[in-house]
Amino acid sequence: MKVAGVFLLLSLALLCFFSGEFSQGGQDKRGWITRSEGRFPGKGVLRHRLFQINCGEFRDPKVFCTRESDPLCGSDGQTYGNKCAFCKALEKSSGKINLKHRGKC
């Protein structure tokens, strides 16, 4: 009986975790997750973590982007060479673009 109870509690905890009940930030009626790093499509914590980009280190205008290749596809259809390039474009657009997916568009 105790094993069944533990299994039930674990199942409920996982259900809540993946359903987005514990996600940080808000979610609008179109399903976009909004945080200080930007907006991301989808629901739930797992989807959010896949599309999470922290642009804090690139907000300083004195920071220049390197040429390392780690492409990101923006919601504007543009492929950005790396996280820094995406974050600079995000800042320039005043948050109007979002991360669509990792990799080339």
UniProtKB/Swiss-Prot annotation:
InterPro entries, sorted: Kazal-type_SerProtInhib (IPR050159), Kazal_dom (IPR002350), Kazal_dom_sf (IPR036058), Prot_inh_Kazal-m (IPR001239)
Domain Kazal-like positions: 49-105
One MF term in the entry's GO annotations: serine-type endopeptidase inhibitor activity
Location (main, coarse): secreted
SMART domains named among the record's database cross-references: KAZAL (SM00280)
Entry's localization field: Secreted
Membrane-traversing stretches: none
Site entry (Reactive bond), positions: R67, E68
Pyrrolidone carboxylic acid: residues carrying this PTM: Q24
Gene3D superfamilies: 3.30.60.30
UniProt keyword Secreted present: yes
Main function: Serine protease inhibitor selective for kallikreins. Efficiently inhibits KLK4, KLK5, KLK6, KLK7, KLK12, KLK13 and KLK14. Doesn't inhibit KLK8.
Name used for this protein in its record: Serine protease inhibitor Kazal-type 6
Organism: Rattus norvegicus (Rat)
Top-level taxonomy: Eukaryota, Metazoa, Chordata, Craniata, Vertebrata
